[in-house]
Amino acid sequence: EHHGFSKTAAKTPWLKRRYLPYPVLAREIVKSFDALPLKDVPRKVRVGVVGEILVKYQPDANNHVVDVIESQDCEAVVPGIMEFMTTRPYITDWNEKYLGTGGNKTLYALMRWSLDRYNAPIKAAIATSHGKFKQDDPMPELVEKAAEVTSIGVQAGEGWLLTAEILELIEQGCPNVICAQPFACLPNHVTGRGMFGKIRRLHPDANIVSIDYDPGASQANQLNRIKLMI
């Protein structure tokens, strides 16, 4: 962004209004950021960040990995949290077939419908930006992506969704991925580091590195591994 720190976004008169309908609010937010002037330069190298939910989003837990990526003149790409919060309604068929724990099908169908309705204004607003902003893949597509590499039955921790997010980033033109995880988070080592081999066979251009974030971990080693990957 040309000015830095999205200064133009602060000059939005709609912020002063007490209430806006949700679809209107979504459109105004996208419109404000879409209006930001951009530098006419080639796109920077993109580096994705996935991993354990706390380490992925909390800067103090991941030693400010987004700042590290941007300090290397790269673009950080962090998938949203909505998918993590809404996985259950989309895997009921698998759970019913293999575990017998599919639950109330009508209830989960209603939940899926409600989530789709909730996301619809956001998707419609982003669609008006002419491709400047990335649309997240729908949850059913993420389930299909994960099933190519691992089992949907891997549901501990971030489970199959972690694998799906890596595949989503690679297929959207971000083959460089940092998988951030606590040292002792075994489920994430299985669905993260454990899937690297198969992902690389499917996508030879994948450039994935696993970084352990722990109070006893060396920050110098973390920085070196990130820089070597880039």
Model-derived features: positions:
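An N-terminal assembly and electron-transfer interface module characteristic of large anaerobic redox
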Residues: 1-230
